Regions:
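Conserved Rossmann-like nucleotide-cofactor binding loop
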Residues: 22, 51, 192
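N-terminal FAD cofactor-binding segment of flavoenzymes
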Residues: 40, 48-97
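Extended hydrophobic secondary-structure segments that form protein cores and membrane-embedded regions
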Residues: 14, 42-50, 182-186
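FAD/FMN-dependent oxidoreductases across multiple families
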Residues: 246, 272-322
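Glycine/serine-rich loop-strand microenvironments at binding/catalytic pocket rims
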Residues: 1-17, 21, 135-142
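Helix-loop-beta segment of a Rossmann-like dinucleotide-binding subdomain
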Residues: 99-120, 129, 156, 265-266
């Protein structure tokens, strides 16, 4: 109780947990609308990563309609390098061969033409700079650890303590987390945020939704020889190396200066206990149509993250008290 009495506390109008594309877009939209109406609004965005974009792994194909609505002049705001999609391919893979599915078989919503291939991490960093230029306070390195409730309403969060040893002891550099109270709190933590889960459970936001389903996505960023690079190529596959009882697929996006984002997704309802998504990803890269594009290149970075796959019917109610 004594620690709670000395805990630093600040109050804001809107608190957003997570400085990903959703969290930053929310902050920018709120701020620009407030500015249009000559209203003052204090917005704080907390990000657990050490810097904006640190936890964003996906190579991305971005439909510019979202940017057009959020920032109509976005092309004049020095956006990150983007390659317009000019070649959109889908293959079914076998152990040695492949079958390309003609584009006319796919519904319009699956077409990537007029979209842009880019690094989502760089897009998020760019959005972060725009948010800060608008006067939005963005705090990287500040994870939200606990939700504050008052009369069954969310009124803010408590940030994590700093200066804790691996044994759980307070070090000389210990700094207690602070309370950030807000009129409105937005949780934009990603696919399986730990605070989001507690909010969903407390307010039973998923009682009318189907069960959520998840996959694991593994991604690498490669720099390839210029002769292997096809700017604007977006390629997706399904099939090998996964068997017909295991769901998943792959993506490959060519963008920037000889950069290729390659990823592999495995649905987490697979039955084979010996299956390793990592090993399947490595096997996938030995397929001729993948190997030929990566040959002579070097891997620059890699990572993995959970992906929501339940679809629209699994989306919980998105509003709650607070």
């Amino acid at each position: 109780m004594q620690e709670e009495n000395i805990r630093e506390s600040i109050e804001v109008d809107v608190l957003i947990i997570g400085a990903g594309p959703a969290g930053l877009a929310t902050a920018i939209k709120l701020k620009t609308e407030a500015n249009k109406n000559n209203q003052e609004i204090n917005i704080v965005v907390l990000e657990k990563g050490s810097e904006i974009g640190a936890h964003i792994l996906s190579g991305a194909v971005i439909d510019p309609i979202g940017l057009d609505m959020l920032l109509p002049n976005w092309k004049e705001l020095d956006p990150p390098d983007m390659s317009e999609v000019i070649d959109d391919r889908f293959y079914i893979l076998g152990p040695a061969g492949s079958l390309r599915i003609p584009n006319f078989f796919f519904p319009r919503l699956m077409s990537n033409h007029n979209c842009f291939a880019t690094s989502l991490s760089n897009v998020v960093k760019w959005l972060g700079n725009i948010a800060q230029s608008l006067g939005i306070e963005v705090y990287p390195g500040f994870p939200a650890s606990e939700i504050i409730y008052q009369e069954d309403r969310v009124v803010g969060v408590i940030t994590g303590d700093f200066g804790i040893s691996k044994e759980g002891e307070k070090k000389d550099s210990f700094m207690q987390g602070m309370e950030i109270r807000a009129k409105y709190t937005v949780f934009a933590e990603g696919a399986r945020g730990h605070l989001t889960k507690t909010v969903i459970e407390k307010f039973k936001l998923d009682k009318e939704s189907d069960f959520q389903k998840y996959g694991i996505g593994l991604k690498e960023l490669w720099e390839v020889p210029e002769e292997n690079h096809k700017p604007g190529l977006v390629q997706h596959t399904m099939g090998w190396p996964l068997d017909n009882k295991t769901g998943g697929g792959s993506f490959m996006y060519h963008f920037g200066k000889n950069l290729v984002s390659v990823g592999f997704v495995v649905h987490l309802n697979y039955k084979n206990p010996s299956l390793s998504p990592f090993e399947e990803f490595q096997r996938y890269k030995t397929h001729p149509i993948i190997k030929d594009m990566l040959s002579g290149g070097k891997r620059l970075s890699y990572g993995a993250r959970v992906i929501r796959e339940g679809g629209y019917q699994s989306v919980p109610k998105l509003t709650f008290p607070g």
